[in-house]
Amino acid sequence: MPVAVKPFKVGDVEVGAGELFLIAGPCLVESEAHALKMAHAIRAIAERMGVPYIFKSSYDKANRTSINSHRGLGIQEGLRILGRIRNDAGVAVLTDVHDPSQVPAAAEVADVLQIPAFLCRQTDLIVEAARSGRTVNIKKGQFLAPHDMKNAIEKVTSQGNERVILTERGSSFGYNTLVVDFRGLPTMRGFGYPVVYDVTHSLQRPGGLGSSTGGDSQFIEHMARAGVGCGVDGVFMEVHDNPAAALSDGPNSLPLARLEPLLEKLKTIHSLVRDEL
C-alpha cells in the first residue's frame, strides 16, 4: 500500500517528494582542495543525471577502530571548509555531530545534522539537533530493529521539528560483518518520513583489517539497486576519486568513475517503483 511521506526542502533539494536524491562525498574532509574538488565533481555528475544532490563529509570521525586512525581536521577547520563548499559549489551540506555541544556550530554551516548510528539512542544529542531547526538525519544503529526508529523520530518531533530523515546502514552479523534486511526500508518508510539507504557503510567490515575497517566495494552497485528497488527516497554513498588513498573508509567507498553509470541505473529503477510508494 502506498505510504504518504512528508516532503520538505533541504537547500534546493526536495526530500520525500517522489524524486530520488543523492547524499554523497568523501567520508572525511581530508583537505580543503580535495573536498572542493569532490563536491564540484559529484555535483556535475548529479546535474547531468538529473539527481538532486546533498554533499556529505565529516570534520571529525570520533568512532575509529584504532587510536592511530586519522580523525580529521577538527570541528573549527572542518566546518570552515564545509561552509566554503556550501557557498562555492552551491550545494546543501550534511555533516555528523557527536555531542550536543557541537550542534550550535555545526548548525550554522550544515543543512543536515546527522546522528551517527552508534549514537542513535542518545536523547540529549538528538533533542539538541532537533532544536537547531536543521534537518536531522538519524542513522539506524547496527544493533537496532527498524521499528524501534519510531522512538528516534519522536525525539525530534517532540521539539517541533518535522524535518526528519531515517537512514539504513546495515546490522551487525557476527564479527566484522554487516548485513542488510531490506524489509527494514519499507518498515521505516511506513512512519511517514523519508528513508535513505546508506549503501557504502552497509558494506563495511568493521575492524576487519585489525587496526582499521575493511569493506566490500565490489558489491556497491548490487546493493544500491536492491535498496532503490525497495522504494527509498534517497541513497547515501561515500565517493572518492582514489579510494586506495582515502584517509577513512576507502575499502567501502565508491570510486568516482563508477558514480555516473550507477546513478543512471538507479534512476531507471526508481522510476519503475515510485508509483508504488
Give the positions of each predicted feature.
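Active-site-adjacent loop and "lid" segments of alpha/beta metabolic enzymes
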Residues: N68-Q76, V112-L119, Y175-F182, L203-V228, ...
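Glycine-rich, proline-tolerant flexible connector loops at the mouths of alpha/beta enzymes
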Residues: P26-A35, Y53-I75, H240-G250
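Catalytic alpha/beta core domains of metabolic enzymes, predominantly
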Residues: S132-V239
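Alpha-helix-loop-beta-strand connector modules within alpha/beta enzyme cores
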Residues: A41-M49, N68-L94, A129-T135, L185-V195, ...
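N-terminal small/glycine-rich loop or linker at the start of catalytic domains
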Residues: G11-V29, S57-N68, P194-L209
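Catalytic beta/alpha-barrel core
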Residues: G72-G74, D88-Q102, D111-D124, T135-P146, ...
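N-terminal amphipathic alpha-helix/helix-capping segment at the start of soluble metabolic enzymes
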Residues: M1-L22, R80, S271-L277
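Structural preference for beta-strand elements that scaffold enzyme active sites
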Residues: E19-I23, G50-K56, A92-L94, D111-V112, ...
